[in-house]
Design a protein with these regions (language model features):
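Pyridoxal 5′-phosphate
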Residues: 1-386
């Protein structure tokens, strides 16, 4: 759902909240004093995303803004009064993507949703079967926000280009967790948010490949070369750049320490009877688990864990007020009772071994207690350890 702000990024942003608070567009020294820190931060973003100097990285408030910019500008620039009227998304996109796509249906856009397999991913073959010369945009996430499953976005981008369509990926869960080199990819557009890789909330960006033109979503001043109006959040940009620099420098740590802790937690859950996890470990980003614990309502588990200081969710935090069954579980064809048992657990580099041990203990205790009072589950206390 989010991450704590990295202490180094926090310290770096503080001066721009207190002393160096100038507007970069101002001509006086308070404004010009922000130019070098901004350039340094942008250099870190280009390096962290593996982008070419010829590409654009436009600062936005978050990935949701970036995604809405892509979809609505594609409608105006590539669909309205043109021969193309189709948009393709996967069946497990974040609500920011699915809601933006659903909105455009009201204006005559044909929305095609790709099916997903039992691991919760759409494949390049799924895309080949439905894409056509009418397709304007394909949008498939890089890594799923609930399962952590990684999609083959490079291959899907090639398929989109064969039909003359643009390819966008919601890279929010991938940036800072796996190696990304966008200049070696055919991806046209990639959106991201800083708070997913230990940067501050309220800041993100949109990668735009050289030669791709998008009309602005926000009109006003000539900020970001006229592509995104609004006074720049200097403190946020500086912290985001530093956070991404740190995250990309620690990718090997992510893939060893965090993956080991994640696997320890996952293995402990799977030792309990009637439990499952969506997706193979090796096909997921290193920090995410979407588990199903039969006989235990996801919301009941959340409340039990929360009172013991453990933060978990039943799905996307951006839809956490909706207590319906988990949409990912529905998409992979899980039975309705199982879809209500989803439990999402995510780790960061700041988690410790003792915290994982504590989480295992509390999940086991909560499972035993909740199954014992379940009207739909045959509870056998001998099946549990601890």
């Amino acid at each position: 759902a989010t991450t704590m702000l990295d202490p180094q990024a926090y310290e770096l942003m503080l001066p721009f909240l207190k002393e160096n608070y100038g507007n970069p567009n101002s001509l006086h020294s308070f404004g010009s004093d922000t130019h070098k820190p901004l350039k340094d931060a942008m250099d870190k973003l280009y390096a962290g995303l593996g982008a070419s100097d010829l590409d654009d990285i436009i600062i936005t408030s978050c990935a949701t803004e970036s995604i809405n910019w892509v979809f609505k500008s594609v409608y105006f620039d590539y669909i309205l009064n043109k021969d193309r009227n189709e948009i393709i998304i996967s069946g497990v996109e974040h609500p920011a993507v699915s809601a933006a796509a659903n909105f455009l249906e009201k204006f005559g856009v044909k929305l095609i949703t790709l099916p997903v397999n039992n691991d919760g991913i759409s494949t390049p073959q799924n895309l080949k079967e439905v894409i056509s010369d009418k397709t304007a945009l394909v949008s498939v996430m890089w890594a799923n926000n609930e399962t952590g499953m990684i999609f083959n976005v490079d291959e899907m981008a090639k398929i989109a280009h064969e039909k003359g369509a643009l390819f966008h990926t919601d890279a929010t869960q991938a940036v800072g967790k796996i190696k990304i080199i966008l200049k070696q990819s055919e991806i046209d557009l990639a959106s991201f948010s800083a708070h997913k890789f230990h940067g501050p909330k309220g800041i993100g960006g949109l990668f735009i490949k050289k030669g791709i033109n998008l009309s602005p979503l926000l009109h006003g001043g000539e900020h970001m070369a006229g592509r995104r109006s609004g006074t720049l959040n200097v403190a946020g940009i500086v912290a985001m750049g530093e956070a991404l620099k740190i995250a990309t420098s620690m990718l090997n740590f992510e893939d060893s320490h965090i993956r080991r802790l994640r696997d320890k937690l996952e293995d402990a859950i799977l030792k309990m009877p009637d439990t499952s996890v969506v997706g193979k470990k090796e096909d997921r980003i290193p920090n995410t688990i979407l588990a199903s614990i039969k006989g235990v309502e996801g919301e009941a588990m959340l409340w039990d864990l929360n009172k013991n200081g453990i933060a978990a969710s039943t799905g996307s935090a951006c839809a956490s007020e909706d207590l319906e069954s988990n949409p990912i579980m529905n998409a992979i064809g899980a039975e309705n009772d199982l879809a209500h048992t989803a439990l999402r657990l995510s780790l960061s580099r700041f988690n410790t071994e003792s915290e994982i041990d504590y989480a295992i203990e509390e999940i086991n205790k909560a499972t035993k207690r909740l199954r014992a009072i379940s009207s739909t589950y045959a509870y056998n206390p001998n099946n549990y350890k601890g």
